[in-house]
C-alpha cells in the first residue's frame, strides 16, 4: 500500500489501475478466494476493489488459482478481440483516450493548489485558486517572435463566456445612482448638440464654483410624444420610469422607452483608488474611525470622527471668524476632494497630446479605420486581431472590428460614441486598478506626510480648481502619470466593448437581448444638467464624442480606388494618405519589385541587400508619424485647410525622392518591355482589364481585277435578284438554281465558274473568303476564330443577308 500511494499522484489514475478496472469489467467469471487478514495499521484508506494493485493481488491469490485466472484472462482477451473485430471502437486503441481530458484537468488543478498548504474544501476557494493560476500567474507567459504570448492550453478548461473575478479587480465596481431626468436619452436634440465641426476644441472640466445651479429636469424644449404610453392605474398619468417618450426620439430610443422602465443605473466606478481616497479624506476632511476592539477603552479621547482642521485653526488661516465663510470653505474643500480632483486627474491623463495620439491609434485598430485598414490591405495581415491587457499582447481572431459599418446616420454615431465612451471607462479603470495594486503601507504613510506638509496651502487656496490642481500634484505625481500613460491604452476590439456593455447593462437590471440600450444613454451631456457625482461620466462622454470626431470615425468618407482607405484625421492625412502623399503612393507601387545589393566585403560572404517587402513597408508605415501636423486639441482636418502641411510629404522607407523616381522608372520600363515582348495576356491586378490587348488583324487590301471591276454593278443587281430565287446573293456563295450544273456565276450566266472568275488564281479566291470576317460573339480576337460577316439576326425584310462591311 505504501508503494502504491507513493507512485500514484493527483494528476491522473495510474496505468495499472485503468487496466485493472477494464479487466475486471470484462472478466466472465470470478473465484472467491480467502485473503489473509490484514493488519489494522495497514488498512488506512478504503480502496475500491476495481483499483487493486498487482502486488496486493499476488500476495492474496494462491499460485494455482493465479494460473487459472491467467488462463481465463487470456481466453477473455481473445473473446474481446473477436468482439472488437465485429464491433470495433477506435477510441479503445491503447489507453482510453477519453481519460486524457480528465488527466489534463487534474494536472491543472494540482498545479493551482501547489501554492496552498491545505487543500481547500469550498468551491469558491478552488475557483479562486484556479483563476489566480490561470490569469495571474507568478511567472509571466513566454513571448513569441511575433510579440504575442504563447497559447495557454490551461484556458481550455475555463468557462468561455464567464467573466473571471480575478481579472475584474476594479471593473466589477459600480456606482449605483438614480438616473437623472436630463440624461442623454431624454434629449431628442442630443445628436445635433454633440455634432462637432472644423475648429472645435477638446472639452474642459468644470467645478462647482463655475456651475452653481444644476437642472435635472426635462426642459422646455422637449415635448412628450402624442402617442406615449400611459399607465392605467396612475392617477396623475405619470410614467414610473425615468425615460420619457418624446416627439423627436429616433427609432432606437422610441423602442427602448417602450421596452423598459428604469429608475437607477449601475455606472462604472471612476473613483480614484480607495487607498488614496481614504488617506486624503482622513487627512483633509474628517478623521477616519477605526473599528472598535474588545479591549478598547471607550472613555479614551480620540480624534476619530472629528474634522481634520478645527474651526480655530481654519479661522487663523483664513483670518476671519465668520461662520458663513468657514462653512463655505469647508464646502469648497469637500467638493474639491470628492469631485474636482477626480476630473483633474482624468484631464491630465487623457488630454496629454501623446496620450491622445495613442488613444486615437487604438481606435483606428478597434474600428479598422484609415491607415490601419491600408496597412492590413498591403501586408495581407489582419492587424486588428491583436488585443492586449496590461501590456501583454494576444492574438484573438474571434473579435470583430467592422460591424459599425453596417450602421448609418444617427444610429452609427450613437454606437461609435458609446464604444469610445466605454473604451475610456475601461482604460481609466485599468489605470486605477494598477495604481491600487501597487500601493503599499509605506507609500500611504509617505502620502500622509505630504498631505500634512501641504495642509495649510490646500485649505487656503484661491478657488476650487486651484485646490484640485494642488491636490492632484500630490496624489497623482508626474512619475505615476507618465508610467500609466506609457502602458496604456490597451488594444481592444468591438467584441470586448460589447461584452463590457452587456456586463454593465446586466448589473443595472437591463436585459440586453430585449432592448437596444447603450450605457451612454443614461449619462447627461452637460455639466449644468448632471449631478456632481456623475461629472466624471459626463466628461468622458464629451471626450469620447470629441475623439470620435477627431479620429473621423463618425462618418464613412471612404470611396473607390485610392479612396478605399481614406480617413481625414491628422493621423492619416496627409502623411499616411495615398491620395495626398504622392511619394508614399509611388513607394507603395514598387513594393516587392526590386532588391538593392551592395558590394560584398569579401568574396565568401554575400553583401547585405535591401528588399522592400510588404512586411518591411508596413512596419515603417505604422511607425510613420509627423507631430508637426498633428493637432491634438483642435479638429483641423487637412482637407479643410488652404495652407500646405508643416512638414514635407515623404515616403516611409525610401525618403529620397530621386531614388524613388529612378526605381519607379525602372519598374515601369520593365513592365512596358513585358507588355511588348512578353507572351500571353497581362491583366491589371486591380481592375482585371487587359494591359496588352491583341490588336485585330489588319484587313487585306482588296484589289479587284478589271474584269471583276467592270462587272461590279451587274454583280450587285444579280445578287439581289438571285436572293429572291434561293441562289447565292454575294461573293463566295454558290449559284444554286442556275441554268444547269455548270451555271451559277456571279450574274447567273452560263459558263462562268462557280467561285469567282479565273479558276487558276488563288489570290482572288482567298480575298473572297477573307472579305467581311468578324470575330465570334464573346470570343477573344485571337487566332482564326472568325465567322463570315453575315448578320443572321432579322433586320428589315425576312430572308435577306447583309454583310457588315457594306454600308
From Swiss-Prot:
GO terms for biological process: intracellular transport of viral protein in host cell; symbiont-mediated suppression of host gene expression; symbiont-mediated suppression of host translation initiation; viral translational shunt. Pfam families: Adeno_100. It is found in: Host cytoplasm. The modification Phosphotyrosine is found at residues 365, 682. Induction: Expressed in the late phase of the viral replicative cycle. One of its GO terms (molecular function) is RNA binding. Its main location: host cell. The keyword Repressor does not apply. Residues 59-70, 79-88, 744-755 have a biased composition (Basic and acidic residues). Residues 1-88, 684-807 are annotated as: Disordered. Residues 348-466 form the RRM domain. Residues 280-345 are annotated as: Binding to host EIF4G. Residues 756-765 have a biased composition (Basic residues). Residues 726-743 have a biased composition (Gly residues). Protein that inhibits host translation while promoting late viral translation by ribosome shunting. Blocks host cap-dependent translation by binding to eIF4G, displacing MKNK1 from cap initiation complexes and preventing EIF4E phosphorylation. Binds to the tripartite leader sequence of viral late mRNAs and recruits host eIF4G, PABPC1/poly-A binding protein and 40S ribosomes subunits on viral mRNAs, allowing ribosome shunting and efficient translation of late viral mRNAs even though conventional translation via ribosome scanning from the cap has been shut off in the host cell. Monomer. Interacts with hexon protein; this interaction allows chaperoning and trimerization of hexon proteins. Interacts (via N-terminus) with host initiation factor EIF4G (via C-terminus). Interacts (via RRM domain) with viral mRNAs that contain the tripartite leader; this interaction allows ribosome shunting and expression of viral late mRNAs. This is Shutoff protein. It comes from Human adenovirus C serotype 5.
Amino acid at each position: 500500500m505504501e508503494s502504491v500511494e507513493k507512485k500514484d499522484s493527483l494528476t491522473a489514475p495510474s496505468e495499472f489501475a485503468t487496466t485493472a478496472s477494464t479487466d475486471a469489467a470484462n472478466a466472465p467469471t470470478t473465484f472467491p478466494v480467502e485473503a489473509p487478514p490484514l493488519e489494522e495499521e495497514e488498512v488506512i484508506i478504503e480502496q475500491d476493489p476495481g483499483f487493486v494493485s498487482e502486488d496486493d493481488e499476488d500476495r492474496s491469490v494462491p499460485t494455482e488459482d493465479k494460473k487459472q485466472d491467467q488462463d481465463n484472462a487470456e481466453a477473455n482477451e481473445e473473446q474481446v478481440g473477436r468482439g472488437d473485430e465485429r464491433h470495433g471502437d477506435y477510441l479503445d486503441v491503447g489507453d482510453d483516450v477519453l481519460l486524457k481530458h480528465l488527466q489534463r484537468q487534474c494536472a491543472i488543478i494540482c498545479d493551482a493548489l501547489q501554492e496552498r498548504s491545505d487543500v481547500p474544501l469550498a468551491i469558491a476557494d478552488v475557483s479562486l485558486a484556479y483563476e489566480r493560476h490561470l490569469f495571474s500567474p507568478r511567472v509571466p507567459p513566454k513571448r513569441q517572435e511575433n510579440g504575442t504570448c504563447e497559447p495557454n492550453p490551461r484556458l481550455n478548461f475555463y468557462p468561455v463566456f464567464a467573466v473571471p473575478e480575478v481579472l475584474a479587480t476594479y471593473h466589477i465596481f459600480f456606482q449605483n445612482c438614480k438616473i437623472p431626468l436630463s440624461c442623454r436619452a431624454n434629449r431628442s436634440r442630443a445628436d445635433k448638440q454633440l455634432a462637432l465641426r472644423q475648429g472645435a476644441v477638446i472639452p474642459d472640466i468644470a467645478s462647482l464654483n463655475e456651475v452653481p445651479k444644476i437642472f435635472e429636469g426635462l426642459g422646455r424644449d422637449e415635448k412628450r410624444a402624442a402617442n406615449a404610453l400611459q399607465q392605467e392605474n396612475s392617477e396623475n398619468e405619470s410614467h414610473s420610469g425615468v425615460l420619457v417618450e418624446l416627439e423627436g426620439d429616433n427609432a432606437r430610443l422610441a423602442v427602448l422607452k417602450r421596452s423598459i422602465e428604469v429608475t437607477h443605473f449601475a455606472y462604472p466606478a471612476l473613483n480614484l483608488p480607495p487607498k488614496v481616497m481614504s488617506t486624503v479624506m482622513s487627512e483633509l476632511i474628517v478623521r477616519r474611525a477605526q473599528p472598535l476592539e474588545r479591549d478598547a477603552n471607550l472613555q479614551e479621547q480620540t480624534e476619530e470622527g472629528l474634522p481634520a482642521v478645527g474651526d480655530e485653526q481654519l479661522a487663523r488661516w483664513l483670518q476671519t471668524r465668520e461662520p458663513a465663510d468657514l462653512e463655505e470653505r469647508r464646502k469648497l474643500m469637500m467638493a474639491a476632494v470628492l469631485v474636482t480632483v477626480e476630473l483633474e486627474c482624468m484631464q491630465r491623463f487623457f488630454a496629454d497630446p501623446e496620450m491622445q495620439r495613442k488613444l486615437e491609434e487604438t481606435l483606428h485598430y478597434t474600428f479598422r479605420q484609415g491607415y490601419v485598414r491600408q496597412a492590413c490591405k498591403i501586408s495581407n495581415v489582419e492587424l486588428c486581431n491583436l488585443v492586449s491587457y496590461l501590456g501583454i499582447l494576444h492574438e484573438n481572431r474571434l473579435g470583430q472590428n467592422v460591424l459599425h459599418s453596417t450602421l448609418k446616420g444617427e444610429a452609427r454615431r450613437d454606437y461609435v460614441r458609446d464604444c469610445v465612451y466605454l473604451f475610456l471607462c475601461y482604460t481609466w479603470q485599468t489605470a486605477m486598478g494598477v495604481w491600487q495594486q501597487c500601493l503599499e503601507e509605506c507609500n500611504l504613510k509617505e502620502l500622509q506626510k505630504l498631505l500634512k506638509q501641504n495642509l495649510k496651502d490646500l485649505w487656503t487656496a484661491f478657488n476650487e480648481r486651484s485646490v484640485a490642481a494642488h491636490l492632484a500634484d500630490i496624489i497623482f505625481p508626474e512619475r505615476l502619470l507618465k508610467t500609466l500613460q506609457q502602458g496604456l491604452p490597451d488594444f481592444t476590439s468591438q467584441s470586448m466593448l460589447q461584452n463590457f456593455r452587456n456586463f454593465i447593462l446586466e448589473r443595472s437590471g437591463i436585459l440586453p437581448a430585449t432592448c437596444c440600450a447603450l450605457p451612454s444613454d443614461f449619462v447627461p451631456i452637460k455639466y449644468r444638467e448632471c449631478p456632481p457625482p456623475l461629472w466624471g461620466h459626463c466628461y468622458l462622454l464629451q471626450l469620447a464624442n470629441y475623439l470620435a470626431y477627431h479620429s473621423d470615425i463618425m462618418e464613412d468618407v471612404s470611396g473607390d480606388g485610392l479612396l478605399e482607405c481614406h480617413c481625414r484625421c491628422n493621423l492619416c492625412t496627409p502623411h499616411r494618405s495615398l491620395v495626398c502623399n504622392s511619394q508614399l503612393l509611388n513607394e507603395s507601387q514598387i513594393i516587392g519589385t526590386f532588391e538593392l545589393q551592395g558590394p560584398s566585403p569579401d568574396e565568401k560572404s554575400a553583401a547585405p541587400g535591401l528588399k522592400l517587402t510588404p512586411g518591411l513597408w508596413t512596419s515603417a508605415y505604422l511607425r510613420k508619424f509627423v507631430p508637426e501636423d498633428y493637432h491634438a486639441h483642435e479638429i483641423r482636418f487637412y482637407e479643410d485647410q488652404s495652407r500646405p502641411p508643416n512638414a514635407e510629404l515623404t515616403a516611409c522607407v525610401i525618403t529620397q525622392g530621386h531614388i524613388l523616381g529612378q526605381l519607379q522608372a525602372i519598374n515601369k520600363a520593365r513592365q512596358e518591355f513585358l507588355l511588348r515582348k512578353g507572351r500571353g495576356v497581362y491583366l491589371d491586378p486591380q481592375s482585371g482589364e487587359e494591359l496588352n490587348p491583341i490588336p485585330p488583324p489588319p484587313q487585306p487590301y482588296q484589289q479587284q481585277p478589271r474584269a471583276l471591276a467592270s462587272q461590279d454593278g451587274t454583280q450587285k443587281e444579280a445578287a439581289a435578284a438571285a436572293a429572291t430565287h434561293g441562289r447565292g446573293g454575294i461573293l463566295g456563295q454558290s449559284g444554286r438554281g442556275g441554268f444547269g450544273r455548270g451555271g451559277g456565276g456571279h450574274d447567273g450566266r452560263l459558263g462562268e465558274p462557280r467561285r469567282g472568275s479565273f479558276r487558276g488564281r488563288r489570290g482572288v479566291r482567298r480575298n473572297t473568303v477573307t472579305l467581311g470576317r468578324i470575330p465570334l460573339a464573346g470570343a477573344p480576337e485571337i487566332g482564326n476564330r472568325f465567322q463570315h460577316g453575315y448578320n443572321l439576326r432579322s433586320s428589315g425584310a425576312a430572308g435577306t443577308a447583309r454583310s457588315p462591311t457594306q454600308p
